[in-house]
A protein has these predicted regions:
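Soluble catalytic domains of enzymes that build or remodel membrane lipids, polysaccharides, and related
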Residues: 1-121
Length: 121
C-alpha cells in the first residue's frame, strides 16, 4: 500500500476498510522525512491524520452529481469539493471524472486534476 518515489512517499488505502483500519495503515506508512502523499476515496479521515500528511487526494462526494441531491451533500459532508489546508497539510476533494448511479450530472461537473509537485526551496 506504500510506494517510495525519491522524496515522495505514496500511500494508497483500500476504500473497503473501516476508518480505524485506514488510519492505522496511514500511521504505519508515514515517513516523516519525506513528502507524504495519500490517495484515498473518502476524505473523512483527514482530520485525524492531517498532521502527518502533506497532500491527501480524495473524491467520494462527486460534488453532489445531480440536483437536488447536491444540496444534501453540502449538508452531510464537511469536505465536499475543493482544496483545504491546515498548517502544512492539504486535502483536495475532486468531483471526479465519472458518475455514481445514473450516468449523468446536473448542477455539477466532472474533472480530471493535474498536480505539479516541486521540491521545497
Amino acid at each position: 500500500n506504500s510506494k517510495f518515489l525519491d522524496d515522495i512517499n505514496l500511500i494508497g488505502i483500500d476504500d473497503n476498510l473501516s476508518n480505524d483500519k485506514q488510519i492505522e495503515i496511514v500511521n504505519k506508512n508515514i515517513k516523516k522525512e519525506n513528502f507524504n502523499l495519500l490517495l484515498i476515496h473518502k476524505p473523512s479521515i483527514w482530520l485525524k491524520i492531517r498532521n502527518n500528511i502533506d497532500l491527501m487526494l480524495s473524491g467520494h462526494t462527486h460534488n453532489g452529481q445531480i440536483f437536488p441531491f447536491n444540496l444534501f451533500v453540502r449538508l452531510q459532508f464537511k469536505f465536499k469539493y475543493n482544496l483545504y489546508n491546515y498548517n502544512n497539510s492539504n486535502l483536495y476533494v475532486s468531483s471526479g471524472s465519472g458518475p455514481w448511479g445514473p450516468k449523468m450530472r446536473l448542477g455539477t461537473f466532472n474533472e480530471v486534476i493535474l498536480f505539479n509537485l516541486s521540491p521545497k526551496e
